[in-house]
Amino acid sequence: MSPTERPRIEGDRELEILAATLEVLGDVGYDRLTMDAVAARAKASKATLYRRWTNKLSLVIDALHHSKGPAHVPDTGTLRGDLMELVCGMGGLADPETVAPFASVLTAIARDADFAEAFRTEVVGPKVAASQQIWERARQRGEVRGDADLSLFEPALAGIVLHRVFVMGEQPTPDLITRVIDQIILPAATRQPAPSH
Protein backbone atom coordinates (compact mmCIF):
# COMPACT_ATOMS: atom_id res chain seq x y z
CA MET A 1 0.00 0.00 0.00
CA SER A 2 1.50 3.38 -0.96
CA PRO A 3 1.74 6.33 1.49
CA THR A 4 -1.14 8.10 -0.25
CA GLU A 5 -3.44 5.11 0.37
CA ARG A 6 -2.69 4.87 4.09
CA PRO A 7 -4.65 6.85 6.67
CA ARG A 8 -3.50 10.40 7.32
CA ILE A 9 -2.36 11.51 10.74
CA GLU A 10 -4.58 14.23 12.18
CA GLY A 11 -3.69 17.90 12.49
CA ASP A 12 -0.13 19.18 12.38
CA ARG A 13 1.20 15.90 13.75
CA GLU A 14 1.99 14.55 10.28
CA LEU A 15 3.96 17.71 9.43
CA GLU A 16 5.89 17.38 12.70
CA ILE A 17 6.80 13.79 11.86
CA LEU A 18 7.89 14.75 8.34
CA ALA A 19 10.04 17.59 9.73
CA ALA A 20 11.59 15.20 12.27
CA THR A 21 12.32 12.77 9.43
CA LEU A 22 14.27 15.44 7.54
CA GLU A 23 16.17 16.36 10.69
CA VAL A 24 17.19 12.75 11.33
CA LEU A 25 18.04 12.30 7.65
CA GLY A 26 20.34 15.32 7.80
CA ASP A 27 21.92 14.16 11.07
CA VAL A 28 22.61 10.49 10.35
CA GLY A 29 21.97 9.89 6.64
CA TYR A 30 19.53 7.54 4.98
CA ASP A 31 21.48 4.36 5.73
CA ARG A 32 21.38 4.92 9.49
CA LEU A 33 17.92 6.50 9.68
CA THR A 34 15.45 4.25 11.50
CA MET A 35 11.76 4.48 12.25
CA ASP A 36 12.75 4.36 15.96
CA ALA A 37 14.97 7.43 15.57
CA VAL A 38 12.26 9.38 13.75
CA ALA A 39 9.63 8.36 16.32
CA ALA A 40 11.91 9.51 19.15
CA ARG A 41 12.69 12.83 17.45
CA ALA A 42 9.00 13.44 16.68
CA LYS A 43 7.92 12.26 20.15
CA ALA A 44 5.59 9.78 18.49
CA SER A 45 5.12 6.05 18.76
CA LYS A 46 6.44 3.71 16.10
CA ALA A 47 2.86 2.48 15.71
CA THR A 48 1.84 6.00 14.67
CA LEU A 49 4.51 6.02 11.98
CA TYR A 50 3.66 2.55 10.71
CA ARG A 51 -0.04 3.41 10.46
CA ARG A 52 0.91 6.02 7.85
CA TRP A 53 4.16 4.75 6.28
CA THR A 54 5.05 1.15 5.53
CA ASN A 55 8.81 1.61 5.95
CA LYS A 56 11.58 4.18 6.10
CA LEU A 57 11.68 4.50 2.30
CA SER A 58 8.04 5.62 2.11
CA LEU A 59 8.51 7.93 5.11
CA VAL A 60 11.66 9.62 3.77
CA ILE A 61 10.29 10.00 0.25
CA ASP A 62 7.08 11.52 1.65
CA ALA A 63 9.11 13.94 3.80
CA LEU A 64 11.28 14.98 0.85
CA HIS A 65 8.26 15.30 -1.44
CA HIS A 66 6.47 17.45 1.13
CA SER A 67 9.54 19.67 1.59
CA LYS A 68 9.57 20.41 -2.14
CA GLY A 69 6.14 21.97 -1.92
CA PRO A 70 3.33 21.57 -4.43
CA ALA A 71 4.18 20.99 -8.07
CA HIS A 72 3.56 24.59 -9.12
CA VAL A 73 4.52 25.71 -12.62
CA PRO A 74 5.23 29.44 -12.49
CA ASP A 75 4.08 31.56 -15.42
CA THR A 76 5.52 35.05 -15.04
CA GLY A 77 5.70 35.64 -18.78
CA THR A 78 9.50 35.36 -18.99
CA LEU A 79 11.97 32.50 -18.78
CA ARG A 80 14.03 34.40 -16.22
CA GLY A 81 11.03 35.10 -14.00
CA ASP A 82 9.80 31.51 -14.22
CA LEU A 83 13.23 30.08 -13.37
CA MET A 84 13.64 32.45 -10.43
CA GLU A 85 10.23 31.54 -9.04
CA LEU A 86 10.74 27.80 -9.57
CA VAL A 87 14.21 27.66 -8.04
CA CYS A 88 13.85 30.30 -5.31
CA GLY A 89 10.29 29.49 -4.23
CA MET A 90 9.16 26.99 -1.58
CA GLY A 91 11.07 23.75 -1.96
CA GLY A 92 13.55 25.40 -4.29
CA LEU A 93 17.32 25.46 -4.09
CA ALA A 94 17.40 28.69 -2.07
CA ASP A 95 15.33 27.05 0.68
CA PRO A 96 17.78 25.92 3.41
CA GLU A 97 15.34 23.25 4.65
CA THR A 98 15.30 21.69 1.19
CA VAL A 99 19.06 21.73 0.70
CA ALA A 100 20.09 20.62 4.22
CA PRO A 101 19.34 16.88 3.84
CA PHE A 102 20.52 16.76 0.23
CA ALA A 103 24.00 15.36 0.97
CA SER A 104 22.31 12.35 2.60
CA VAL A 105 20.00 12.05 -0.40
CA LEU A 106 22.92 12.01 -2.86
CA THR A 107 24.58 9.21 -0.91
CA ALA A 108 21.34 7.22 -0.74
CA ILE A 109 20.77 7.62 -4.49
CA ALA A 110 24.19 6.11 -5.16
CA ARG A 111 23.73 3.20 -2.73
CA ASP A 112 20.06 2.22 -2.85
CA ALA A 113 18.34 1.55 -6.18
CA ASP A 114 14.84 1.52 -4.65
CA PHE A 115 15.45 4.87 -2.97
CA ALA A 116 16.92 6.31 -6.17
CA GLU A 117 13.90 5.25 -8.22
CA ALA A 118 11.39 6.57 -5.68
CA PHE A 119 13.30 9.85 -5.32
CA ARG A 120 13.47 10.40 -9.07
CA THR A 121 9.78 9.61 -9.53
CA GLU A 122 8.15 11.20 -6.48
CA VAL A 123 10.44 14.08 -5.55
CA VAL A 124 12.34 15.15 -8.66
CA GLY A 125 9.74 14.14 -11.23
CA PRO A 126 7.27 16.99 -10.52
CA LYS A 127 10.09 19.58 -10.59
CA VAL A 128 11.42 18.18 -13.88
CA ALA A 129 7.93 18.33 -15.39
CA ALA A 130 7.56 21.95 -14.24
CA SER A 131 10.97 22.83 -15.67
CA GLN A 132 10.10 21.20 -18.99
CA GLN A 133 6.93 23.28 -19.22
CA ILE A 134 8.85 26.47 -18.42
CA TRP A 135 11.49 25.82 -21.07
CA GLU A 136 8.96 24.79 -23.71
CA ARG A 137 6.89 27.95 -23.10
CA ALA A 138 10.07 30.02 -23.38
CA ARG A 139 10.84 28.38 -26.72
CA GLN A 140 7.29 29.10 -27.93
CA ARG A 141 7.69 32.77 -26.90
CA GLY A 142 10.95 32.95 -28.86
CA GLU A 143 13.14 33.44 -25.76
CA VAL A 144 15.25 30.35 -26.46
CA ARG A 145 17.04 29.64 -29.71
CA GLY A 146 15.27 27.02 -31.79
CA ASP A 147 18.13 24.51 -31.89
CA ALA A 148 18.71 24.50 -28.12
CA ASP A 149 18.56 21.00 -26.61
CA LEU A 150 16.13 21.68 -23.77
CA SER A 151 16.96 18.36 -22.11
CA LEU A 152 20.43 19.82 -21.40
CA PHE A 153 19.16 23.16 -20.13
CA GLU A 154 16.44 21.83 -17.80
CA PRO A 155 18.82 20.27 -15.21
CA ALA A 156 21.72 22.70 -15.76
CA LEU A 157 20.64 25.34 -13.25
CA ALA A 158 20.17 22.84 -10.41
CA GLY A 159 23.41 21.08 -11.34
CA ILE A 160 25.46 24.27 -11.21
CA VAL A 161 23.90 25.47 -7.95
CA LEU A 162 24.29 22.08 -6.24
CA HIS A 163 27.94 21.90 -7.37
CA ARG A 164 28.62 25.31 -5.86
CA VAL A 165 26.88 24.30 -2.62
CA PHE A 166 28.31 20.81 -2.09
CA VAL A 167 31.68 21.04 -3.81
CA MET A 168 32.56 24.72 -3.38
CA GLY A 169 30.88 25.22 0.02
CA GLU A 170 28.73 28.21 -0.94
CA GLN A 171 25.29 28.99 0.46
CA PRO A 172 22.38 28.55 -1.99
CA THR A 173 21.22 32.15 -1.86
CA PRO A 174 18.84 33.90 -4.26
CA ASP A 175 21.84 36.03 -5.30
CA LEU A 176 23.82 32.94 -6.34
CA ILE A 177 20.84 31.60 -8.27
CA THR A 178 20.29 34.97 -9.97
CA ARG A 179 23.94 35.11 -11.05
CA VAL A 180 23.80 31.58 -12.47
CA ILE A 181 20.60 32.36 -14.38
CA ASP A 182 21.80 35.75 -15.69
CA GLN A 183 25.43 34.89 -16.43
CA ILE A 184 25.24 31.25 -17.55
CA ILE A 185 21.78 29.85 -18.26
CA LEU A 186 20.15 32.70 -20.19
CA PRO A 187 23.21 33.57 -22.31
CA ALA A 188 23.72 29.90 -23.22
CA ALA A 189 20.04 29.44 -24.11
CA THR A 190 19.83 32.53 -26.30
CA ARG A 191 23.27 32.85 -27.93
CA GLN A 192 23.79 31.27 -31.30
CA PRO A 193 26.47 28.56 -31.23
CA ALA A 194 29.81 29.31 -32.85
CA PRO A 195 30.15 27.85 -36.34
CA SER A 196 31.98 24.51 -36.35
CA HIS A 197 35.14 24.26 -38.41
Region spans (language model):
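Basic, helix-initiating cap at the start of DNA-binding domains
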Residues: 1-43, 47, 58
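C-terminal peripheral helix-coil segments that are non-catalytic and often amphipathic
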Residues: 1-4, 85, 125, 129, ...
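Short amphipathic alpha-helix in the helical subdomain of ABC transporter nucleotide-binding domains
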Residues: 10-13, 124, 146-154, 173, ...
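Hydrophobic alpha-helical connector segments
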Residues: 71-100
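Helix-loop "lid/cap" segments that line or gate small-molecule binding pockets
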Residues: 88-94, 102-111, 181-188
